[in-house]
Amino acid sequence: MKNICQKAVLLLLAALLIVSCQSKPQRVKPAPPCAPAKSLQLMGYTIQAGAFAKVQNAVRLTETLKDQGLDATYFLAKDGLFKVRFGNFATKEMARQRAQRLRDSGIIEEFYIVQPEDYAVAKRKRYGTYYLRESLVKTAREFIGVPYLWGGTSRENGFDCSGLTMTVYQLNGLNLPRHSATQYDAGNPIDKRELQKGDLIFFATNDNGKVSHVGIYIGNGRFIHAPSRGKTIRIESMSCSFFAKRYIGARTYL
């Protein structure tokens, strides 16, 4: 009797196994596609004017252009002179016409149209992304010592943190948004261990835990940023306890 029961159980298990093998396989849902990497819009045609030995003259032109409703900033060029760039035009002719009107009104004298291929980002295909990253860091270093002012985007009034990062990126041909929160949203998330020169790092310096501060990573655990009011743009270490506790994430745009 015992043997009969054992045989019955074995036959039942075999039948179940056959049915299981013959049943239709369940359809496996495909994995959702990866979200496409975000990318910044490239700068178009920009007007460059002025070649000043004294920074104060570049500051005055920058502020005058802002009064005309133009986004303007100035920088120290390779020849040691301060120059001003402003505008972001879709075509060279649009930039030329605007520059001509400004010259006719006496606001600027000679001008030069910066073309998209003149920017560091346009040279990435030839020299590689490393070249662009080094250019971003070099540009950021040129602003060390400038005073901080919330909402400021000129070297006269100073830079706030996101004004600095926006200007550095735009001078290299990448149209980074104005505010730290939108800069955070516009980039691709990366782990802290994946940071490379030119990436942006973000902090929550307010009590609400939201993005409120940004800096440009320059390698070896350091970054350049515009700190609190009354201080100047400087190099800081990510291991500093203040920033280590408030680090919220990093973004790359390259």
Task: State each model region's role.
Residues 2-149, 154-197, 208-211, 219, ...:
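Acidic/polar low-complexity segments and flexible, solvent-exposed patches
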